[in-house]
Amino acid sequence: MTMNKPKTNYAGYACCVICGLIVGIIFTATLLKAVERKLIHTPLIDKTIKDAYIREDCPTD
């Protein structure tokens, strides 16, 4: 009985570590995706805003 308790504790600890790593990987992946979206979309938004201002400033179109 004394030998089984440390094994179950180690198994539980390993399970917690694995679950924590999986959650951490998913969390960091979502953060990286959000940062990439912000970095990629902000220049596109700036370009569309500039294009809109140019279109408004030019009545010849």
Curated annotation (Swiss-Prot):
Bilayer-crossing regions: 12-32
GO cellular component, one term: membrane
Sorted UniProt keywords: Early protein, Host membrane, Membrane, Signal-anchor, Transmembrane, Transmembrane helix
Extracellular topology ranges: 33-61
Membrane topology: Single-pass type II membrane protein
Subcellular location: Host membrane
Cytoplasmic side stretches: 1-11
Further remark: The variola A45R protein corresponds to the N-terminal region of the vaccinia A40 protein.
Family recorded in the similarity comment: Belongs to the poxviridae A40 protein family.
Name listed for the protein in its UniProt record: Protein A40 homolog
Lineage: Viruses, Varidnaviria, Bamfordvirae, Nucleocytoviricota, Pokkesviricetes
